[in-house]
Each structure stands twice: as C-alpha cells, then as structure tokens.
Amino acid sequence: KVAPKLVVEDTPVVQTPVVPVASEKKTKDVKSVRFELAVYMLGNAMLIESVPEQTDLAHREFSQKLAVNILKAIHRQPGEPVTQLITWPLFEHPNAPKDQEAASSYLKGKLQGMKVDRDVELVIYSGRSAADFALGESLTPGEKIKRDGVDHLVTYSLGQLLNSPAMKADFWDQISAS
C-alpha cells in the first residue's frame, strides 16, 4: 500500500485577543459592616435592639429586663419572650461576605421569617441604628410606618429609656398611640 501524500498549505495564523477572566475584573471598594441585634418576641410583637459594642453586663441585663417588660405590658400575656441574638458578619473568614448589601439581604430574610412564624403585627425598633440595620431606613424616634400589614415603630434605644424618664414617658405615649 502506498501512504497518502501530505499537502501542506500556507495558511495565515489568526491571533485571538486575550480576554481577562472574571477574577481579574476590578472590584469596587466594599465597606464591611458589623452589628449585633437582640430580637425579643412575645405574642404578635417584636422588639429589635442594636446592642452597643462595649456594653457592660449590668447594662445588658437591665436592657433585657426593660425589653421583656415592654413586651409584657403591650400584650398583657403570661410567659417569657423568645430572645435571639443576630450578629453580622455571620462568621470570620476572608472570603465571607461582610458588606452592607449582603448584611441587609440576610437580615431582611431572617427577620421576615421570624415575623411570619410569629404572625407579628408590631415591630419596635429600639434606637435609630436598629432601624437602620433591620428596616433599611433612617427614621427618627417616634416615626411609624406600615409595611405588608405590619406596624413598624422607631423609638429611643433601651439605654436612653433606662437613663431618661422623659424619654420613657414619650415612648409610652408612642405605644399608646399605636
């Protein structure tokens, strides 16, 4: 048998442009966010407090007692509130999401699930920072909005209520008007 002849033609060499991979794209500077929220639930009410970073144990205990008393006074129901602490970021790792958008998405989903499970009708945000993180809006104490059939009331922080009888009286006026 005879082997076939190889014919070599002059073909032009085509160069394809180099396309950078996705990981080489420039990323915008993302500011990391840290917070700790205490969520107290009793009946169909929820109280969300932004826990200050450097809070001593006695202050934290007084804040918890005040939150419990507020919820009991609103609903006049026996029993103790369910309390949950939500921290962000979820865990420490260089690749873990820490930005405001991820925090907001996680927190909204988490709180929405808690509201649905308990059929919540009233959410009290204790302090502006609690409202900023949990509600995603910057409201001042005394402001109230309604979303999806749930009343959202922003009030003073528990620390402010503990230290100021005038703020505490104003808070009870806000609750009475709800």
Report residues per predicted region:
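A polyanion-binding, active-site-adjacent surface
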Residues: K1-S178
